[in-house]
Amino acid sequence: MIGEIGYIFLIFAFTLSFLQFFNSVKISFFYFSEESFKFLKSLTYFISFFLLFSFFSLIISYVISDFSILNIYNNSHTNKPLLYKISGTWGNHEGSLLMWLAMLGLYGLLFTKFTNQESSIFNSRALFAISIINIGFIGFTIFTSNPFERITPIPLEGNGLNPVLQDPGLAFHPPLLYLGYVGLTIPFAYSIAALLEEKIDNQWAKAIRPWILAPWIFLTLGISLGSFWAYYELGWGGWWFWDPVENISLLPWLLSTALLHSNRVTEKRNNLKSWTILLSIIAFSLTLLGTFIVRSGLLTSVHAFASDPARGVFILSFLFLVTFFSLILYALKYEKIENNKSFHLISKEGGLLLNNVFLCASAATILLGTLWPLFVEVTTGKDISVGSPYFKLVFLPLIIPAIYLSGISINLNWKLNAMQSILDKLGKFFIIFIFIIIGIAFILEGPVMMILGLSLSVWLFLS
């Protein structure tokens, strides 16, 4: 019975998402009224609650071992500890998608509750973008990945959770990572709304900042915890194996880091506005690309959930439509939103822009190495792999300057800095950095890159 309730909640959320879409279109482009906006907010609340309740219904079904649900039969067992029963909910394709939806509902709830209520039309346009994401993902879950699918006759016992996943890391790593992935929906929605309004200023940048920072924090925690889990679980290949799914999780983090820096320039100097918008769109698109890679089976990965081309086609089509129309809108509105002022390279904004270049180039090299085997297979029919030698060769020379520049940029002034002042600061920074490396190398005995990585981490912290 609980399974049916959870499925009905999904159907309700899907139906209301269409109402959310049509109502947001009416308010954003045709006719605004306070009553319509209040109704739109109510729809968003109901969608959020239905998605959260649907997810909790699946968790409860796991806890009580309802093996009449195929998903639970395949991934749980009555004798499993409570922790693994609960975390088993998202240790599979269908359950993880429902967790994605629950977090999408949570972010929609928080956005509606805490955004500036005076900007009703702007918020309606942001909810217009969110409604499209709701329809796409809820529809994908209902029609291709129903987590509440029944099985008959009802088995007496389940198959149990995959032994590799029976680790406390499963309870925290995927939720943190998904909070980061899904959280980038809000900056994306903010950017679409700003393009539609043709207004991007420092107030917009200030409002969007916490919605960028929160996903970045969750992605940082999720990736770090995943690396630690991979380290002590030998089956995953060490701290970082340059696996396609690992790579694709790093891409949104790199882009959201660049987005944080770019948005800071927009907030403080009213500059790099179009670049900030573009980063928001691409960062979110990369989360959709990650979903495609994990669930399509087109790239081999120890982290992949499923190998179902039909699901892959659905996600790829959705990725194409969202990204294509977002970039078309960006191109149409570019001249109306961009009024970049020139600034000196030797300044905080110049340093942050240069840092952005390195971060985006780093992301591009990872994306190329991850998708290259797929491109070669499609064009030539040959099966190749791109391993750590490539990534170490092209990624490290880009990310090391990016990290070092971050520490320097923080200490520069806005506008122009005197060259002598810069040289003095650079000299001090370089000496401090050398002492950090020597100190860590003296304390630790390990590979050069490990020492350099720790040194850069300390460098950033001290900066």
Language model regions located:
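Structural signature of hydrophobic alpha-helical transmembrane segments
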Residues: 95-101, 178-181, 241-254, 289, ...
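Alpha-helical transmembrane segments of multi-pass integral membrane proteins
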Residues: 133-143, 183, 215-224, 283-290, ...
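Contiguous transmembrane helix-bundle modules in multi-pass membrane proteins
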Residues: 1-33, 51-53, 244-251, 280-281, ...
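A conserved hydrophobic secondary-structure block that centers on an alpha-helix together
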Residues: 11-25, 96-151, 155-227, 235
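Transmembrane-helix bundle segments that line or gate the permeation/cavity pathway
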Residues: 51-73, 78, 87-108, 140-149, ...
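Membrane-interfacial loop-to-helix junctions in multi-pass inner-membrane proteins
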Residues: 29-51, 113-135, 196-217, 265-281, ...
